[in-house]
Amino acid sequence: MVYSYSEKKRIRKDFGKRPQVLDIPYLLSIQLDSFKKFTDQDPTGERGLEAAFRSVFPIKSFSGNSELQYVSYKLGEPVFDVKECQIRGVTYSAPLRVKLRMVLFDREAAPGTVKDIKEQEVYMGDIPLMTENGTFVINGTERVIVSQLHRSPGVFFDHDRGKTHSSGKVLYNARIIPYRGSWLDFEFDPKDALFVRIDRRRKLPATIILRALDFSTQDILDIFFERVDFTIKKDSLVMKLLPERLRGETASYDIKDAEGNIVVEKGRRITARHIRQLEKTNTTELEVPVEYIVGKIAAQDYIDPDTGEVLVTANNEIRLEDLAQLSLAGIKDISTLYINELDHGAYISDTLRIDSTTNRLEALVEIYRMMRPGEPPTKDAAEALFQNLFFSEERYDLSKVGRMKFNRRLEIADDVGTGVLSNDDIVAVMKKIIEIRNGNDEVDDIDHLGNRRIRSVGEMAENQFRVGLVRVERAVRERLSLGDLNELMPQDLINAKPISAAVKEFFGSSQLSQFMDQNNPLSEVTHKRRISALGPGGLTRERAGFEVRDVHPTHYGRLCPIETPEGPNIGLINSLATFARTNSYGFLETPYRKVVDGVVTDDVEYLSAIEEGRYVIAQANIELDGEGRILEEQVACRHKGESTFMRASDIQYMDVSPQQIISVAASLIPFLEHDDANRALMGANMQRQAVPTLRSEKPLVGTGIERALAVDSGVVVAAKRGGVIDYVDASRIVVKVNEDELRPGEAGIDIYNLTKYTRSNQNTCINQRPCCQVGDPIVRGDVLADGPSTDLGDLALGQNMRVAFMPWNGYNFEDSILISERVVQDDRFTTIHIQELSCIARDTKLGSEEITADIPNVGESALSKLDESGIVYIGAEVKGGDILVGKVTPKGETQLTPEEKLLRAIFGEKASDVKDSSLRVPNSVTGTVIDVQVFTRDGVEKDKRAIEIEEMHIAQARKDLSEEFKILEEGVLSRARNLLLAGGYTQAQLDAIPRKELLTQVIDDETKQTELEQLAEQHEELKADFDKKFEHKRRKITQGDDLAPGVLKIVKVYLAVKRTIQPGDKMAGRHGNKGVISKICPIEDMPYDEQGNPVDIVLNPLGVPSRMNIGQVLEVHMGAAAKGIGNRIQAMLEEQREVAELRGYIKQAYDLGETQQKVDIESFTDEEVIRLAKHLKDGLPTATPAFDGAKEKEIKQMLELAGLPTSGQLRLFDGRTGNAFEREVTVGYMYMLKLNHLVDDKMHARSTGSYSLVTQQPLGGKAQFGGQRFGEMEVWALEAYGAAYTLQEMLTVKSDDVNGRTQMYKNIVDGNHQMQPGMPESFNVLLKEIRSLGINIELDQE
């Protein structure tokens, strides 16, 4: 493999055995592609905004004299960029402008004659835009729209598993689910009649639907039944025979063949042998006794030709006397329905008997009564209702997916049918459910991923937009009918409010629009790749059973079987597998390599769950030779959802990668194959809660996916084009682009601005640091700057800690963790948290609130950190209770005492009519002010601080732009110099020419002269562009802010809080091994090895066997080896050994094991080897991909290379006594994470605080500054101890005895430590509740 300059800084040793056929796809594509389809112009009009417009427009007036047509739309430019939106707290969106055409028709002339056409662009609200990382900024916060897994439209057949009826009989049902519109269900009842329900309402006999579609009884019988024909002879009947129909029946008479031989005697069972005999003798007729036809059902009406009297009606049983009448009337041929108990049930025939309707109108009225109970039906209303239910394109749409699923299930050609149902469709569904009831077909598996599809952002936004448009449509139709159309323009008809309201509601408060989990890059990526079965149109937690939550064979390679939350949502919220993607229908598909005649090719094909079932698919770990031929005779593979063994020649596809089945979070766990699945689930979930540490450190034992994840997450800065680093500082990187990657006529400079110390959604700190130096050559995709939790472009969620597995004085009982003081001193797990505190000045009834440093009754010391505007300085260190922003609120007029009046008269009246409502630091917080933002309403005078901040921003913008201009100008001038040199100037002449005049020189060569003139033009353009950009920025900075009604000013203060690790914080490894820190132990007391090096962390060995996450032990061994190799390299560097020796050792490390990774260290220059060695001295980073990782043998080889015992165990000594422990201890390096469950956020104690209004008991919870509940069981405990006085105190003065507790404060102040318990308030509440039942209880107080 060829490594770029940056990649050569640090190469991860990969233990993967299989070559990578397919790179990990871009991880956020599910979000970005979906939204792109929504906003991009689609000429076919099948999706996105275009589809929504085309489905609603044209809107015709009721009279048909005018219509409003849609022409095209365009999205404008957003006013603010993403960062500005986050700071100002507004939505990142673009205005939608739609070109509409209003057409008026001439009433007098022929229909369709156009009288007038008006075209106009109309504003239709703002559409939130997706940022390049797949998120939305709504009201200043980043949100993610989670994709939904819902039941695909189409037709589904199912049964109730015998649960509905007490007999345990299985009742089948069919359901037609449209994309939008009414559901149509068919179901059997215990008596085997078929019923229909519309929208899950009251059931009707299914034949009512057929009658409503204008089928007669005769038509219905002909569609659903075959016939048996009889001819009447004198005293017997002759039946037309199809021998196959007799199978399984018991003969009620002797059955003779065509030659008159008895084939089956009376009372015997007819078998396949008998049927073969009858077929052999070519028997086509059979004489049967007259009684045989009695009880059979007539297939049609029989009418006396002379009198016209109906002798036998269709679907009725034939009696003996009917036969006599038919003979008399001269009717010789009779047909009956072919029915048998086994596989031709009489279901429709029975249903017709229940059906009370006889014609179309009665059926329509019956349906109308069921849908609209209580309304009197009219013929037109009934017809319109039924027509609108399933046959109107406005009200019903199966969608492309639904039609495809419907046709495939009913074996109809794919191109037949539209978005609405046809008569044939309904008949086909009824035929299929009868076929299933007859046992000739199977029911569907609704948890199969071929029956569930993904609805992503774009599609959901389109649906919401359409909802808004439909609301507008009604209003437009009314306005078209009412007003004088000659005067109106399209914009007078359209009100954009309903549209923006629908869109806003979806992005702001839909269940699937979630506050982005921004703890670290992994949690961002997994949140965007999440697939939820909950949400509108999905399941609910309470109703979801086990089957839906379970892992299904079709999840293979599509949804991760590991990563799902614990708790009530388990299995309902899933994560997309690493390589999965959605196809055009919204079904998940996964890639496979094609296998031809036992040879694996490199052709990759994506298969959906439906297609996959047809093929035989082998796993990724089968043995292949050099040509890709499968070596094993019998190969483990999957076919039709089952795992089997098959011959190599039968294999049609094979997996692309062993990591194919798991999600990104699970594939970050090394040695995943050695962990129990439950613990792996916890490991995957806990990595998402890791807090970014102060100094990120790459994992020594990784899986090789860390880099792809960090780059795709968007937290690092990756180079857009190759070039050379021209300038680097903490907030900006400038790259001079390579000549071959330039677009014509551009300056060839890329500028990357870095994000510095901003706050994430979870209050962690987002900060980018450059990881390149001036002069470094870079290629496209190289990482230029690290973000939070990344280290040289690798994801780095935690720290490599030296771990020993041993008990230590009970301090690691029950998963507790003992850590060394050194971890705290070195700031290994120190994290920075940024809190945003805001102070709002409002306009109140009594006057407006004011932000000022002049606060009543506050001492000088409290104001020491404020400036003259009353706002805290940047850099001030503040603690709980300090004032950040001084604010006073007008107080209502109160009756003044004469003394106060006198004081007012003397000192002026300002001080007493305002009260202090300043923003203070919350109690448990101490930190440093790192930023202050002031937002002022338009038209309100800006204070001094706001103007200062504005000027600072303007200066910053000017500096940024002028530096950018300088760099671009330099690019132009350097090209001009090159031209002049080529045109005959000498270097000395060039040096003498002032910069400004370079572009005005004259060259003899005409082409060069024109090039120089072009450069001069470009320079002018740059100048103009600079002025324009600066003016635009200045205008943006100085304009007033659009604040909520009644708000005059908002001041936001950002505090940075530094949190070191301390007892009570939660830590975890990557294998679900979590624990809480119990003690921070002095370095000298920690166990140490023979070299005197103490360990960092002591974990309990009992946490491993019962939990079966052995991966952590292997990780520790591998980590020890990696660190040991790093130590050896460091020693070589310190001893300044020959580069050749260093190169040899590094080569040995990379070549170890049977891996497919080949690092050609020989091709590296000496400088590159030394630079690589400097990055490896902290440990050789290794990668063991899931299911394809390092084997035990390789770990031992690594330990040998590091010069460590292959047991992985060392002799340790007790730090307190100096004695060796009695047996060797497993010591190595484990990657530990600090999780976002910090004791500082949870610790809470109440002195006195607020009380609940009704019960007068203290509130609960940290947010309310609440107390600890002394509950029922705690009362029992005190009763058991007989602690009567303590109990009385708990139930009265410490809780809800209002008078008692105020009296107690007074007593404490007076130094009298006694209490007088009174009546608890909750007793009075109980009395009131009993009175509300009408029972009067009064308390006689003595």
From Swiss-Prot:
<dbReference type="Pfam" id="PF00562">
    <property type="entry name" value="RNA_pol_Rpb2_6"/>
</dbReference>
<dbReference type="Pfam" id="PF04563">
    <property type="entry name" value="RNA_pol_Rpb2_1"/>
</dbReference>
<dbReference type="InterPro" id="IPR014724">
    <property type="entry name" value="RNA_pol_RPB2_OB-fold"/>
</dbReference>
<keyword id="KW-0240">DNA-directed RNA polymerase</keyword>
<dbReference type="GO" id="GO:0006351">
    <property type="term" value="P:DNA-templated transcription"/>
</dbReference>
<keyword id="KW-0808">Transferase</keyword>
<comment type="similarity">
    <text>Belongs to the RNA polymerase beta chain family.</text>
</comment>
<dbReference type="Pfam" id="PF04565">
    <property type="entry name" value="RNA_pol_Rpb2_3"/>
</dbReference>
<dbReference type="GO" id="GO:0032549">
    <property type="term" value="F:ribonucleoside binding"/>
</dbReference>
<dbReference type="InterPro" id="IPR042107">
    <property type="entry name" value="DNA-dir_RNA_pol_bsu_ext_1_sf"/>
</dbReference>
<dbReference type="GO" id="GO:0003899">
    <property type="term" value="F:DNA-directed RNA polymerase activity"/>
</dbReference>
<dbReference type="InterPro" id="IPR037033">
    <property type="entry name" value="DNA-dir_RNAP_su2_hyb_sf"/>
</dbReference>
<dbReference type="InterPro" id="IPR019462">
    <property type="entry name" value="DNA-dir_RNA_pol_bsu_external_1"/>
</dbReference>
<dbReference type="InterPro" id="IPR037034">
    <property type="entry name" value="RNA_pol_Rpb2_2_sf"/>
</dbReference>
<dbReference type="InterPro" id="IPR015712">
    <property type="entry name" value="DNA-dir_RNA_pol_su2"/>
</dbReference>
<dbReference type="Pfam" id="PF10385">
    <property type="entry name" value="RNA_pol_Rpb2_45"/>
</dbReference>
<dbReference type="InterPro" id="IPR007644">
    <property type="entry name" value="RNA_pol_bsu_protrusion"/>
</dbReference>
<dbReference type="InterPro" id="IPR007645">
    <property type="entry name" value="RNA_pol_Rpb2_3"/>
</dbReference>
<comment type="function">
    <text>DNA-dependent RNA polymerase catalyzes the transcription of DNA into RNA using the four ribonucleoside triphosphates as substrates.</text>
</comment>
<dbReference type="GO" id="GO:0000428">
    <property type="term" value="C:DNA-directed RNA polymerase complex"/>
</dbReference>
<dbReference type="InterPro" id="IPR010243">
    <property type="entry name" value="RNA_pol_bsu_bac"/>
</dbReference>
<dbReference type="InterPro" id="IPR007120">
    <property type="entry name" value="DNA-dir_RNAP_su2_dom"/>
</dbReference>
<keyword id="KW-0804">Transcription</keyword>
<dbReference type="InterPro" id="IPR007121">
    <property type="entry name" value="RNA_pol_bsu_CS"/>
</dbReference>
<comment type="subunit">
    <text>The RNAP catalytic core consists of 2 alpha, 1 beta, 1 beta' and 1 omega subunit. When a sigma factor is associated with the core the holoenzyme is formed, which can initiate transcription.</text>
</comment>
<dbReference type="InterPro" id="IPR007642">
    <property type="entry name" value="RNA_pol_Rpb2_2"/>
</dbReference>
<dbReference type="InterPro" id="IPR007641">
    <property type="entry name" value="RNA_pol_Rpb2_7"/>
</dbReference>
<protein>
    <recommendedName>
        <fullName>DNA-directed RNA polymerase subunit beta</fullName>
        <ecNumber>2.7.7.6</ecNumber>
    </recommendedName>
</protein>
<dbReference type="Pfam" id="PF04561">
    <property type="entry name" value="RNA_pol_Rpb2_2"/>
</dbReference>
<dbReference type="GO" id="GO:0003677">
    <property type="term" value="F:DNA binding"/>
</dbReference>
<dbReference type="Pfam" id="PF04560">
    <property type="entry name" value="RNA_pol_Rpb2_7"/>
</dbReference>
<keyword id="KW-0548">Nucleotidyltransferase</keyword>
